[in-house]
Amino acid sequence: MSFAEEVNREEWMEKIGKLRFQRAEMNRLIMDYLVTEGYKEAAEKFRIESGTQPTAPLDSLDDRIKIREAVQKGDLEQAVSMTNKLNPDILDSNQQLYFHLQQQRLIELIREKDIEAAVEFAQGQFSEQGQESGRYLEELEQTMALLAFDNPEESPFGDLLHTSQRQKVASELNAAILEAEHKKTQPKLANVLKLLLWAQDELEGKKVKFPKMAEIASGTFEESR
């Protein structure tokens, strides 16, 4: 295909429709994602439905699952405690992760409208970290800015109160636990998606007009421009 060629949506979708993927390979990608991210119940259900064997014993996920669930429920104190019991070096050797866990704990106090406790926690926790917290000053300022709004969810930094923020921190902690256990920290599916984004950037850089995937989660495409 020459770089000047324009591919319309119908032609592009027809080409995609002709691609053939083995069901077993797709199932392995899904199972790898569920195991790596610590979704034991979903992995067990998928094993039964698809016959795909997990990439690791599912019982080995229990500690990671409990820690992830604690973060996703907003119980950061419990998540930190369980992580330290599992392996104290995980947080001792990862200042960025520790900051994000404490930041999330602050966010949960703000979510609960416990302003006095939030200010007290921020003054105590982040002043103790001293120079280290200075590295993350912008993130801390954005979090503290939530206190200035009657409805912080509707503020410019309201995304910090979304459940996706908990998910982000849970995934960061999950990856750190995997790394400490000398296991791969990212599911293969994430690498496939990165490759997709890279390929789209390459095509755009070569001025090829094509229907770009605009929303990966839903698989929706833009019209060619």
Swiss-Prot record:
Compartments, as annotated in UniProt: Cytoplasm; Nucleus
Location (main, coarse): cytoplasm
Pfam families linked to this entry: CTLH, LisH
Highest taxon above the source species: Eukaryota
Domain annotation LisH: ranges: 22-54
Keyword Chloroplast in record: no
Record domain CTLH: where: 60-117
GO cellular component: cytoplasm; nucleus
PROSITE patterns for this protein: CTLH, LISH
Family annotation (PANTHER family): RAN BINDING PROTEIN 9-RELATED (PTHR12864)
Family membership noted in the UniProt record: Belongs to the GID8 family.
Protein name (database record): Glucose-induced degradation protein 8 homolog
Organism classification: Eukaryota, Metazoa, Cnidaria, Anthozoa, Hexacorallia
